[in-house]
Amino acid sequence: MARYRHSRSRSRSRYRRRRRRRSRYRSRRRRSRGRRRRRSRRGRRRRGYSRRRYSRRRRRRY
């Protein structure tokens, strides 16, 4: 029983990770698309922050 429970949690975490990766790619695509359309200070600042955050996450993963 314990073993089954463990495997279940493991698969769940894996699914969550995959989902996050997908959303990340999607957001990246949308950002490049809207970049030309509107140039706002808010979007610019957000981009820099997210970039820093992703670099940190990448380091941890690899």
From Swiss-Prot:
Main location: nucleus
Coiled-coil region(s): none
Intracellular or extracellular location(s): Nucleus; Chromosome
GO MF annotation: an example: DNA binding
Annotated protein name in UniProt: Sperm protamine P1
UniProt function note: Protamines substitute for histones in the chromatin of sperm during the haploid phase of spermatogenesis. They compact sperm DNA into a highly condensed, stable and inactive complex.
Assigned keywords, A-Z: Chromosome, Developmental protein, Differentiation, DNA condensation, DNA-binding, Nucleosome core, Nucleus, Spermatogenesis
Tissue: Testis.
Keyword Zinc-finger in annotation: no
Biological processes annotated in GO: chromosome condensation; sperm DNA condensation
GO cellular component term, pick one: nucleosome
Family: Belongs to the protamine P1 family.
Segments of this protein annotated with the region Disordered: 1-62
